[in-house]
Each structure stands twice: as structure tokens, then as C-alpha cells.
Amino acid sequence: MAITLTNFTFLYMDANLKRLGDIVLGFGANVVTLLLILILTITRRNGRCNRRKSYIEKCLLYVTPALGACLSCVDLVLLVRTNRRREVILCFVPLSGFVMWIAVILSLKFACCACHVFTSQILCFWWIFRFLTDALHLNMIFTLQRVQEICLIMLDIAFGISINVLRIKQAHPKIIPLEDPLIEDDDDQKRIVRRLFLEKNGSWWDLFTFGYIGSIMKHGSVKQLELENLLTLPPEMDPFTCCENLLRCWQLQECNNYSTPSLIWSIYGVYGWPYFRLGLLKVFNDCIGFAGPLLLNRLIKSFLDTQYTFRLSKLKLKLRSSIMSVIYRKCLWVNTANRSGFSEGEIQTFMSVDADRIVNLCNSLHDLWSLPLQIGIALYLLYTQVKFAFLSGLAITILLIPVNKWISVLIASATEKMMKLKDERIRKTGELLTNIRTLKMYGWDNWFADWLKETRATEVTHLATRKYLDAWCVFFWATTPTLFSLCTFGLFALMGHQLDAATVFTCLALFNSLISPLNSFPWVINGLIDAFISTRRVSKFLCCLEHSRDFSIDSGFTSEDLAVCVEDASCTWSSNVEEDYNLTIKQVSLRVPKGSFVAVIGEVGSGKTSLLNSLLGEMRCVHGSILLNGSVAYVPQVPWLLSGTVRENILFGKPFDSKRYFETLSACALDVDISLMVGGDMACIGDKGLNLSGGQRARFALARAVYHGSDMYLLDDVLSAVDSQVGCWILQRALLGPLLNKKTRVMCTHNIQAISCADMIVVMDKGKVNWSGSVTDMPKSISPTFSLTNEFDMSSPNHLTKRKETLSIKEDGVDEISEAAADIVKLEERKEGRVEMMVYRNYAVFSGWFITIVILVSAVLMQGSRNGNDLWLSYWVDKTGKGVSHYSTSFYLMVLCIFCIINSILTLVRAFSFAFGGLKAAVHVHNALISKLINAPTQFFDQTPSGRILNRFSSDLYTIDDSLPFILNILLANFVGLLGIIVVLSYVQVLFLLLLLPFWYIYSKLQVFYRSTSRELRRLDSVSRSPIYASFTETLDGSSTIRAFKSEEHFVGRFIEHLTLYQRTSYSEIIASLWLSLRLQLLGSMIVLFVAVMAVLGSGGNFPISFGTPGLVGLALSYAAPLVSLLGSLLTSFTETEKEMVSVERVLQYMDVPQEEVSGPQSLSDKWPVHGLVEFHNVTMRYISTLPPALTQISFTIQGGMHVGVIGRTGAGKSSILNALFRLTPVCSGEILVDGKNISHLPIRELRSCLAVVPQSPFLFQGSLRDNLDPLGLSEDWRIWEILDKCKVKAAVESVGGLDSYVKESGCSFSVGQRQLLCLARALLKSSKILCLDECTANIDVHTASLLHNTISSECKGVTVITIAHRISTVVDLDSILILDRGILVEQGKPQHLLQDDSSTFSSFVRASQ
């Protein structure tokens, strides 16, 4: 920038020796610049540009400094000729400037490698440095009111700014160094990365002014932004690096034997020094706010504000990614037992709410000292104006400190209680979303929703306490400036001093500077409290012991002989040391040789699954040792699948091996299934595999383990979900086939054939190993359970052949959703354009129109009372200044006091009405969202990942609860504040408003240009946030599987990818807001300059515009100063409000989801159905309109009281019969009659409540066992105990404490088999005339299953029972059977009759199982 020194010449010619400091300042500026030029010349000597510069570049690079040198020379000549008798020192400035310009020319010619003029470090430094020195001199000249010299310097500065905003659009050339080193050191690598980042985002000047966001702003203003348009993260903001840094500090605390490692100290260790360095910038920024003149204040503060915010925001983003990554890693490395002290909802809250609150600590911690500093400086300046009169106002401030502390303690208590209830609500919401299908079949969806609303109501009670306490804080601190001015001016007048315009309006400006720190202080304290509470919560979770698995044996066996060694091990699921007596595995000793096939058997609840989990290290071993040798693959009893493609689920992070991959698919009987899927193995599996049948989910989980190629396989009842033919194939080809026959396999099973093939059998009983040995040595006295005849005989010579034949049958029927695992997961919807007015209107409706009107009216009147207070002060000053006042000082004080009281009352009304309206909106939004989701069809949940829905209930609802009311309050305050200024300025001088019109036009253009992009960025932010929570929720469900496969790092990598995308959206959003902020502040500085010049010229009487009396002039100037900041704040707060409104918009998207037809034209009596007659007439049903039907022209009749079995291969459409009967999926054609009534004409919840079902996936929610069995309280205790006894689960219930015992999350207090028995008891308690059993005995042993069928036969006489089964023995004695294949009813009739027909399908099933 060619900053000439002509203006300095005029200054120094008229200066005396008292201005020697100014001369030294200018001389020092040139000398420092010269030294820096020399340093940069030396350090950049080797960098050369290999292309010719353009004509424009040459002008800017060479002509500009040459012009500066010439002007400096002219200044020097003029100075010598006109000031021959002056001190020689006056020549130092132009002389040094001349030398400096020559150095610039030489350095650009021989040393600078800048191929783009704005990437020159030398010129950039010179532009900025000379700009600041000119500004410092401008400060002095303003105090002298030398208008001519002010104009000269402002022209000089304007010339420099005009050059800086010039852009040269061309590509950066490749730098060719003289020597290319063979190996680059780390510093070179860092410089290369840094240069690439600069080349990606723009020049140094662009970085300083955030110009590199310009291309995104232009793109976002004309079209929709996509994720690939976002800015690239700087290298130091890489989430993986941030996570590693924080993790290193945390582990350092653990290594130093800290009793309880603290997250806050770990954060300090990583970010403490960079954060406190920002404090130095903030000190300078705060202090400059009280410096003069006004122009210099605003120019410097504009850059300081944005740079401080930019660096603080980068640190906050790094901290956020660190905390979220560390929490995610901890979830992967902490075993199930140690994690049992935390519910899933609580852990999800750590990730969503607590992480944000800890990050906000960065704002609050600096504000904790910065705000008192600003208050202290303002008070000192008040002292210089009104002496000790300010102490009266200070006394009010001091009195409010203990009040604020007491309120803060109450807020902290309410916040902690609210967070616990928020955790519980998120957990319950997760349970609702996970088990929505089962809840609908039970008809409990409304009851569960009401239960969730009760929890929300309790949470809102504590939220209300917090909000109303916040309202008191806002009231106390918002009224403080008004009370301060009343007490200060009152005491000053009573002390005998006369109020003048200079004193009053200087004090008013200082009072205004007190408003922001005083109003912000309660929010700062609340933020600190929330942050420290969240820090303690997260620290407690991070202190959990991590999972470990070792192998070391000192015995006769060598590590080459043994795969598993368990020595006197006792394990518990509890993480509490005080509960060590509650053992699940008791004194177990077990040794498994390598390569053996071990069958773990036992009755339901005997500890089979717990034994496998103890081997995995998921339980806490309180005694003995458990040691494994080699890698492990694990298949849980409830299969866990990722939301992704089929191939991703099977590979599980392993490289793709074509040969092994297809061998695995064939061995697990998946080749035909996948070939029939839309997209093959690239078809998408929905959330938790909901678009697959139960058997398909089990086989995919098994295929993952088989493909993994581990040394040891722990399999938990993998054959229970498949039919006998598929089970035989899997046993032969997978478990005993070439892929696994040399591996160690430990399998919990009830499958007789698998038991007979085992090398070793382990019999579990009540958590102990009752017996172990080979199948031939097993004594019959142990249990009659396993001495039954095999269900199918592998020695059958034609069995495998039949399996191959039947495998070709198209398996495209699906138990639950669709025939093919098509890509049914819908991408998250993202709105385009501005937030519609309907969103604001809906939020107002949620808050209530009356409250909305009260808020608006009170805010306007509050601002009016404050403006009236200032106008009265102006009137008081004018009257007393002229000496013509007809009223006493006490009269003026009384009127001032009335304004103060009115303002305080209105402030209180506004604060509490805002709190009430925000709470009312929060309650209505949550309840409306729950009601809409409860009535949504199951297809919506199948196509929408639960993590995406849960994001609405966690992050978006948190915004509606907390952030949105806060930013709306700020928006309203800015709006009425600006309205008040405009009214007052209109009263003072109407023509003054004409000056604002062009500036307002520029402001509005900037705002329109910015808003469109900011909306898109906020929507991208919300969309990119959902995969994080979906991935997190998914990982919580499958963490034990991930740990077993040792795939933690793979999943951390997936999470880092999601987090990086989220960070990029946030980073782009921050840069865009700073882009706007800087330009608004710079434009505001120009407005202030213009107003100030007008005021100075107008005061001389030669200017056409007059400002009236001194009081009005002072009032106009004091109101003009905050005008620009209010304009900027209004636009910023409006944009931020629009961003926060995106959360309301996202919630409203779910208000429009399709709804089930809840009502019906026909009503039902209390005793319906009376007979239990079920009729299907030509029923066709499909889950998705684009896929083939799951049921095709199904017709059958089940007479009342009949026990009917439904069989077929895995995925044949058996469960689709129940889906149609319970109206989970509407039928395309045909009709279903129950007791002669068409069920499509019946109220849907009444229909479902009249039917009883035991689902394929047992469901127990967290709460008392009594509520799980009889949530509506319709059964007596004796009846419940009787049913529990008949369902063979009474002993298990008694062992955990009876009906009032607490069921843990997901029913993990009981085994899967016990959960199925409890679900059967729940169904029998309903005493319905129609009972549907969907594989209710799949996870229990054959003996218990036989006893249960006897119970069902005795308890369900006269009841229609529809049984879906894989075991042939389950349906052989029923009254009738239905055989399905590919959704078609291929055969029906009595089992005995079908057996007599050798050509029947049922006969072939029986022959294959004999």
C-alpha cells in the first residue's frame, strides 16, 4: 500500500518538541519495516518464480513503492526548504521512509518469490504496519480537530484500502527450487502442507479477511451447497490428531497414578497454552474498546474481534472433535460390565449435550476475567467523570454479586437433575425406536409415549426452574445500567455538581458499555456451571476400566495346545465392587484344546451366553483367570448388523478376498439370497438389519465371522433362527466344513445334531460347569434334555442333496419387511432456500399467541422506557445548562426514578414471559413429535435409521429447549434497540436518517448474500451431524462384537470420517459468519467516521444540518455510536436465529410423516373376539411398492380354538402373516376377517390390544418386571406368579428379587431364552382368544420347549394359536399347518394327513429332519 508521508510533513512542520514522541514513532515504524524486509529477503532468497509477471503486477509490485519513495523524497526536500532552522531530527521520518521504499523495490526484484502480489509477506506486513501507524497519528489529530489533516490522512488510508481489495485472478505457478532434497524433513513436510492449505484457500490477505470463503458464498447464493463444496480443514484441526493429543494427556494422568484423572486437566494439557495465548489478544481487544478516537477504536477492534473469534472457534472445533472422539473410543474399549453403570441414553447425552457444554467452556473461561476487566475499566472512567458519585451505582453491582451466586447454586442443582432426566428420556426414546414394531403389536405404543411424556414433564420441571432463575439473572443485570445511571447522576447532582452534556453523555456511553458485560455475566456463570458438571460426568465415564484379553499359561499344556484356559473363574455383570457377591459365572474351570468343536448346553438361564461373554472379557472377573490364545470371532445370540451394504457387513473392515468371500457365502447359505437382492451384495441393509428376516440376519452375522478367518469362534445359538434344512447345511459346510474345521469353535446351542457332532460338551447349570467331556461319555443322569431323539439325522444320504435342491428355491420372502434386501434406507431430507415463515408461525403457535404478543409488547415498552429515560436526561441537561430550569433537582430525579421503575417492571415481564414461552414451546414440540412418530407406520422406521430420529430428540430438541430462546431473545433486544435509536434520531434530526439509507442498502445486500449460504451451511451441519449419532448408536449396540473382532481402529476410522465432515461444515459456517462480521464492522466504522465529521462541521454553524441543543447533540452522538453495531448485531442475530430455526424445521419434517389409520368405522366390544375365527381372503401384501409382494393371493381359514403351525424356509414370508394380521403393513388387495369383522374397518389399537403375540425378538424395557409383564395393571399378583410358573421362569424371577425387581436396559438382567419365556408369560396374561407365537421357543432347549408346548396346550384351550416355527417337532401335533414358499401358500392341512402323502411338501420336510 502506497501510504505516502505527505500528511506527516504537515504534522511535523507545525509541531514543537513535545511531539518528539510522534516523530520517533514514525521513524521507528520505518526502521522496523526495513529490518523485517532484510530478514525476509534473506530467508526467501532461494525461492524464485519461473514465469513473467503481468503488466498490472509489475505496476503494483514496483511502481507503488517507487511512488512512495518519490513522495518521501519530495517530503524531505520540502521539509528542509521550509524548516531550515528546525531540528534535524524532523527529517528522520521521510528519510527513513525513502530508504525503506528503496529496500522494498530491491527485495521485490531480487528476493521475493511472490507470483501473486497479495502473497508477498513484505508488502502485506508493510500495508498493515503503515495503516496502524497512520491510525495512531489520526488518533492524535482527532483530539486537535484539525479537519484538513484528518481528510489528508483518510485519503491516504482509503488509497491503501483500495489497493488491498483489488484481486488478480490467476493460478498459482509451481515453485521450482534450485535443489530438490532426496528426503524432506518434518519441517519441510509441515511447510508443504501449510502451503497446500494456503493455496487451497487463498492468499495471506484472504486468510486475514476470510476472503477464501467468497467462492462458497457466491455458490451458495445461487444454488444449493453440497458437501464437496465445503472448506478443507487445516492440518492442525484433523480430528484424529486432536483425539490422539487429548488421549495422550489423559493416559499421562493415569500413568502418573492420579487417583481420579480429570478431563479438565487433560484439556488444559492439550489446549491450555494456545487458549491462554488468546487471552492476550482478548486483553488488547477489550482495552481498545475504551480507547479513542472512535474511528481507530472500531477499525482495530474489527480485526481483533474477528481474529480472536476465528482462533477461538478453531480451538473449540478441535476440542469438540477431541471430546467426541475420546468418548467414542471409550465406548469401544470399555467392556459391557464396566459400562453397566451408564445407560445408553446417558452415554448418548455425553456425545450430544455434554460435549457441546464442555466446548462452551472456551467462551466462558475468558469471559470470567474479561467481563470484570471491562467493568473495572468502565468504572474507572466513570470516576474520572463524576468522581465518587459512581460508588452509589457500584454499590448496587456489589449487592447483586451474592444474589447472583445464590442463583447460580440453584441453577447448578437444577441443571444436574435436568441432565439426569434428559439421559433417562433419551434412553427411553431409544428403547421406543428400537422396539417400535413390538410395541405396536402389543398396542402399547400410546402407553409408552405417555410414559415418555411423563419423563419429559419431570425434565421440563427442572428446565423451568433453570429458565426462571435465568430470568431473574437477566432482570437483575439488565436493570443494573438504568439503576446505575439513576443513582450516579442523582448522587452527583445532590453533591452540588451541575450536569453538563459532556459529563452526562460520556457517562451514558460508559453505562452502555457496561450493559454487555453485565448482561453476559449470568450466562457466563451458567455456562461455567454447565461445563464443569458435564466435565465431571464425562470424566467419570472415561475413568471406566478398559477391556483387555491376554494369554499366559504355566501348566502341562503349552500355548500351542490350548485355545482356552479358565481357572476357577467367577464373573459378574456388575461394575460395582460392592456387588461382587452377585455372580453370574461361579468357579468355572475349563480347558479347550485348539481346533476342537465345543458345544455349550444347558437349560434356559443356566449361564451359556454369560460364559461366552466371560471368555470375551465382557464380564468383570472377580476371581480366577480367563485366558485365550489367538484371535477371536464372535456371533451373538441377537445378530448385530451395520447400516450399510451386504459386503461391508461381511468384510467388517477386512480386505476383499474374492475366493474366500464367495466360499463364505456358499457355506452360510447366503449365495442365493444375495443373488436375489436388488443390487446383489451392494444392496443396503437397513438399520439393525430390519429389512432382513431373522434367519438372514443370523446368517450374515455368521458369514462375517467365517470370513474373518480368526483362530477361535464363539457362536451363541446361531442355528436357532434358521430352519432344519438350512441349519444342516450351515453345520456341514460352515461349522464342520473346510473353512472352520481346523479352528476352535465354542458354540452355545440347543441343536441336537450340533451337539452330537461336538468334540467336547460343556453342560452349564446356574452359572457353573456341571459337566464337561465328549458326547459318548455324557451320563444320562445329568439331564433328560439332551437324550431326546435327533430332530434330523446327518447320516441321511440324501439330505445334503436335498439341501442343494431346496437352495435353488427363491428365498425372497421376508419375515418382517421385504423380500429382498433392497436399498430402502432413505437419505435424510434437506430443505432448500430460506427458512419458511410457516416455521416461525408454528413456533409461535407452540409458544402460544398470547405469550408471543406479551413478549413483543413488553420488549417495545421496555425499550421505550429506556429511551424516555435518556431523553429526560437530555432535557434536564439543557434546562440546567441554560440556567432557566423551573424545577428542582429532586423533581428531575423523581421523574428519572419513575422511568427506572417502569423499565425494571417491563424487563421482569419480558424475561419471565420469554422463559414461559420457551418452555411451553419445548413441551409442545416434544409431545407433538412423539405423537406423530407413535402413529407413523412401521415402514417409516424401517427406512429411517433410529440414530437419525434420535438426533431430533437430542441435539435438535436441545436447541429448541435452550439455544433458540436465547438467540431469539437477543434478536428481539437488537430489533427494539435499533427501533428505539431510529425513533430518537428521528426526533433529534430527521435529515440525519437520509445518511443511513445508502449504508442500509449495503448492509441489506451483504445480509441477503450471506443468509442464503448460512442457511445451506446450517442444514449441511444438521445433515452431517446425523451420521455421527447414527454411527454412535450403532456402535453402542455392537460394541462387544467390535471388540471381539478387534476392529476398534476400523470403527474409529469410520467415526473420524463422519466427524471430519461434520467439522468441515462447522468450520465453513464459522468462516462465513466471520466474513460477514468483519465487513459489517468495517462498514460501520465508515458510518461512525461520517457521523463524527458531520457533528464537528455542524457545530461550527457553517453546515446546513444543525443538531439543536447540546443535550440533543450529545444524545444523537451517543445513539449514533451503537447504531452500526446494532445493525450488525441485528443481521447477525437474525441469521443465527434462522440457523437455530433449522432445528424447528427439522422437527416439523417429522410432523408430516404418514400416519396410520388409527380409527375405524366399526367399534369393538370388550369381549371381542369371542370365537377367534381368522380368515384370509386373497391377501396380497408388499412392504415397498417397488418390490415384489411378500404375500401373494393368500387364502386360508383358521377356525376358533384351532392350533395352527406356519412353516417354511427362512424368509418364506411366515412373519408377514402376522404383520398383515396386526396391520403393521397394509394389504394391497384382499381382506382379513376376525370373527367375521374386516380388520381394516376396526380401530387399529383396539384390534392389536385384542390379540396376543410373542415376537421373534423378545422385548423387555428398563423398569420393574411387573410393568414389563402387566404395564396396564390388569392382573393380580397371584395370577402373574401362576403364569410365570407355567412358563418355567418363576425361579429366575425369584432369584432376581421378584416382580418389583428392576429390569436393566434391553432386559440384560435375563438371558435371551428367559426373555422369550417372559414374553410368553406376558402374552398369556392377556387371555386373548387369538395367540400368535413367532419362534418363541427358538432360543430355549428342546426339553423346556416341550414343556412349554404342553403349557400352551393346557392354558390355551379354546384359544386360536398361530405358531411360526422352524422345528418340525413343534408343529407335528398341531391341528393344522400352513406351508409358505416365496410368499405363496403352497400347502395346508392336518399334519397327519400330509404325512401320509409322500409327495407333499410337508413330508419332504419331515424326511429331511429324520
From Swiss-Prot:
SUPFAM superfamilies to which the protein is assigned, alphabetical: ABC transporter transmembrane region, P-loop containing nucleoside triphosphate hydrolases
One GO BP: transmembrane transport
One MF term in the entry's GO annotations: ABC-type xenobiotic transporter activity
Pfam families to which the protein is assigned, alphabetical: ABC_membrane, ABC_tran
Keyword field: ATP-binding, Membrane, Nucleotide-binding, Repeat, Translocase, Transmembrane, Transmembrane helix, Transport
Catalytic reaction equation(s): ATP + H2O + xenobioticSide 1 = ADP + phosphate + xenobioticSide 2
Domain ABC transmembrane type-1 positions: 255-530, 852-1139
Membrane topology annotation: Multi-pass membrane protein
UniProt KW Protein biosynthesis keyword: no
Domain of life: Eukaryota
S-S bridge residues: none
Residue span, ABC transporter domain: 564-791, 1174-1407
E.C. number: 7.6.2.2
GO terms under cellular component: membrane
UniProt: ATP 2 binding residues: 1208-1215
Tissues showing expression: Ubiquitous.
Cellular compartments annotated: Membrane
Entry similarity comment: Belongs to the ABC transporter superfamily. ABCC family. Conjugate transporter (TC 3.A.1.208) subfamily.
Function: Pump for glutathione S-conjugates.
Protein name in the entry: ABC transporter C family member 13
The organism of origin for this protein: Arabidopsis thaliana (Mouse-ear cress)
Organism placement in taxonomy: Eukaryota, Viridiplantae, Streptophyta, Embryophyta, Tracheophyta
